[in-house]
Amino acid sequence: FNQANITDAIQEFERTLLTPNSRFDKYLKGDETAMTADELAGYDLFKKYNCATCHVGENMGGQSYELLGIKHDYFADRGTELTIEDNGRFKETKNERDRHRSKVPGLRNVALTAPYFHDGTQATLDEIVKAMAKYEIGVDLNDQEVKQLVAFLHTLTGEYQGKLLVNDNDVH
């Protein structure tokens, strides 16, 4: 293997992950009918609560490492012993500033990727939305806000455009 082959392999893999034409994409391209009133209200809340500060870019995240529990101590509330994974980026850097700092996940197709958080403790989008509001911005969302934010997150699911990878050496 050489660097060029590895890079080509990664590029090919990434092409299989493309999921364009989400309803959110269609809305951004000018289709005002692509999203419902609740979904648009969720998008407004997403911006109001500064979610896009971390969930930014085409993939709506995945570009930075952020601290979990800025406003409340998630790990104390969880009520279980800390694990190696709870250390976040600290595992690699050994820099105390990186303890509990994890990569911000991209939100594209987030409705398909449960469970949530680095430890899988949040089983549904409703749960993760409430938890993120509490631990990251210090807000207790009401049921309507949760419903609208979750509705918006569902608009980020795109149409799968890739192809399944096939192992030619696979014996049936």
Label for each model-derived stretch:
Residues 57, 135, 155-159:
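Generic structural signal for alpha-helix termini and adjacent loop/cap motifs
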Residues 22-123, 127-130, 137-139, 164-172:
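Short glycine/threonine-rich turn/loop motifs
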Residues 102-105, 146-150:
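Active-site lining segments that contact anionic ligands and/or coordinate catalytic metals
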Residues 1-33:
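Extracytoplasmic redox metalloprotein regions
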Residues 148-172:
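A cross-kingdom marker for long, charged
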